[in-house]
């Protein structure tokens, strides 16, 4: 059998490592819309973790994350951004996979430290980078947050109101990496790997127990919050308004502000005719601040339809940072403070 610390492994193991890495990417892709197999996110990383640390040679270990990111983010981001934003965003998933191949070099560290930091590094590294890109990297921002795959599961996501989506992301990654370490420990015991190269089974059992408790506490809290919701709460009909123009407003020279307002007004009246009381617009629906332009027209529309309107817009002004914001317009004509998606 091959030595885990050498750069050579049998061809069969290498191929299996590649296939398992691709499997992880496929599971992650299926966990997100439009497929919506949300439960796959809770163990999707496990095949790639096993491939990275037990099947692929050390020098090519980063091929595992590169492959699952390619299979997952390649089609996911291409579908999200389409061709409108240019080839950079269309093929962004490919670029991320290439960068990952050169960045995921932690295998040597985990071998030298007996894998005692595997779970901590996996969870903190992943969620920490999510925080960084959400705060400092526009456009990409929160795209493909692992917790978003759970959006349809009301029974599971209620603690997000307490711990934010990052809390949910941490629990999902903790489950994945704990299961991954469990598979590594099982494999080491089965193969009889030397203690210096093997995962500590005692540490793994402790992590399995701790992760089980965290998951139990999360689910129990979620069910408790959901169960405490009012049984006779009023039902409010909400409409999502999309203008369906091919370009964002700051790039669109055909559909002017007036055209966009008129289209929105027509769709708003149509939605109200179907019983909507709250209207949401998609990101960057308008290219003007509703508190500064078309203000009276929008106020009259809100009063006429007796609806609450969440108005999203993007403003580009020379010498100023781009504003990507949303304001709430109430039926009485009052505007809320702007919510800044770009954290300005």
Where on the chain are the PLM-derived regions?
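Membrane-embedded alpha-helical bundles of multi-pass enzymes
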Residues: 3-225, 278
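Soluble catalytic regions of membrane-associated enzymes that act on cell-envelope
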Residues: 224-344
């Amino acid at each position: 059998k091959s030595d885990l610390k050498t750069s050579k492994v049998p061809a069969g193991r290498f191929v299996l490592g590649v296939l398992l890495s691709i499997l992880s990417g496929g599971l992650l892709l299926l966990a997100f819309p439009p497929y919506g197999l949300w439960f796959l996110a809770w163990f999707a990383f496990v095949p790639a973790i096993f491939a990275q640390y037990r099947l692929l040679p050390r020098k090519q270990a980063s091929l595992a994350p590169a492959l699952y990111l390619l299979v997952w983010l390649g089609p996911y981001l291409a579908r999200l951004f389409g061709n409108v934003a240019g080839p950079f965003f269309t093929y962004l998933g490919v670029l991320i996979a290439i960068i990952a191949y050169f960045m995921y070099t932690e295998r040597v560290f985990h071998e030298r430290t007996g894998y005692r930091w595997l779970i901590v590094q996996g969870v903190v590294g992943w969620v920490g980078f999510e925080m960084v890109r959400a705060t400092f990297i526009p456009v990409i921002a929160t795209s493909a947050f692992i917790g978003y795959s759970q959006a349809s599961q009301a029974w599971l996501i209620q603690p997000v109101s307490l711990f934010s989506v990052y809390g949910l992301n941490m629990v999902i990654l903790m489950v994945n990496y704990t299961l991954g370490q469990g598979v590594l420990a099982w494999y080491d015991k089965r193969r009889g790997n030397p203690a210096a190269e093997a995962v500590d089974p005692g540490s793994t059992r402790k992590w399995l127990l701790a992760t089980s408790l965290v998951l139990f506490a999360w689910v129990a809290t979620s069910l408790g919050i959901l169960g405490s919701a009012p049984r006779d709460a009023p039902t409010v009909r909400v409409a999502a308004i999309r203008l369906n123009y091919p370009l964002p407003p700051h790039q669109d020279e055909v559909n002017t502000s007036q055209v966009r307002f008129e289209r929105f007004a027509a769709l708003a009246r149509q939605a109200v005719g179907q019983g909507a009381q709250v209207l949401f617009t998609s990101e960057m629906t308008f290219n003007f601040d509703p508190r500064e332009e078309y203000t009276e027209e929008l106020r009259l529309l809100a009063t006429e339809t007796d609806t609450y309107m969440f108005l999203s817009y993007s403003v580009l002004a020379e010498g100023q940072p781009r504003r990507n914001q949303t304001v709430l317009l109430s039926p009485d004509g009052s505007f809320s403070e702007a919510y800044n998606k770009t954290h300005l």
